[in-house]
Amino acid sequence: MGQKIHPLGFRLGVTQSHLSNWCVQPSQYSELLQEDEKLRGCIKEYVRKYVRTAENYGGIDRIEIQRKTSAIKVEIHTGFPKLFVEKLGPRLKEIRREMQNTLQKSKHLKFIISLAEVEKPYAKATILAEYIAVQVERRVAFRKTIKKAIQLAKEQGNVKGIKIQIAGRLNGAEIARSEWAREGRVPLQTLRAQIDYCHYPAHTIYGVLGIRVWIFQEK
């Protein structure tokens, strides 16, 4: 079988940047990296509880974390900032407290949480994959959902190619299989190509479906 390299990790330092920006001693690196993942998990859990519903979804593209000597800056990139402010604004103190309780080494640091709006949300693989997951969990036909997702991405204007794959017990079938659709070019072997990628799970009554989205954008 051919071995597939992760499209984002393959392009780190070329077209992709790191989500955690800080410098520490090598002995502290793994511990702080785990803390960053816990912070992201904490935020996503609050979004799942209080923002995401059958009609609305989180719409998080990425969460960037910067560490300074006295503070941790968390920047949430979302396609729907108004929804975030409306749902999570009143719970901001609670979120900060939960984040401090999650960490061990960085409890004493100040937390700065900010929102950044994504101009073209459906040109982002993470947001599009989450949209597909919400539709599939609501029992919308997966082929119809894929077709609609491709249409939403193409309407953003800067998308040159898109590929979507769904794998699992589709439509409740006994045997799992995968279905995919592609429009335009998705040159995964070209390093300078601006590729966005996401793998997202959808939880259905028949089991978990794996959704994968590749988007090729203009620079």
Curated annotation (Swiss-Prot):
Part of the 30S ribosomal subunit. One of its GO terms (cellular component) is cytosolic small ribosomal subunit. Keywords: Chloroplast, Plastid, Ribonucleoprotein, Ribosomal protein, RNA-binding, rRNA-binding. The keyword Plastid applies. Signal peptide: none annotated. It holds the Pfam family Ribosomal_S3_C. Residues 47-119 form the KH type-2 domain. One of its GO terms (molecular function) is structural constituent of ribosome. Belongs to the universal ribosomal protein uS3 family. This is Small ribosomal subunit protein uS3c. The lineage of its organism: Eukaryota, Viridiplantae, Streptophyta, Zygnematophyceae, Zygnematophycidae. One of its GO terms (biological process) is translation. It is found in: Plastid, Chloroplast. Gene3D superfamilies: 3.30.300.20, Ribosomal protein S3, C-terminal domain (3.30.1140.32). The keyword Transcription does not apply.
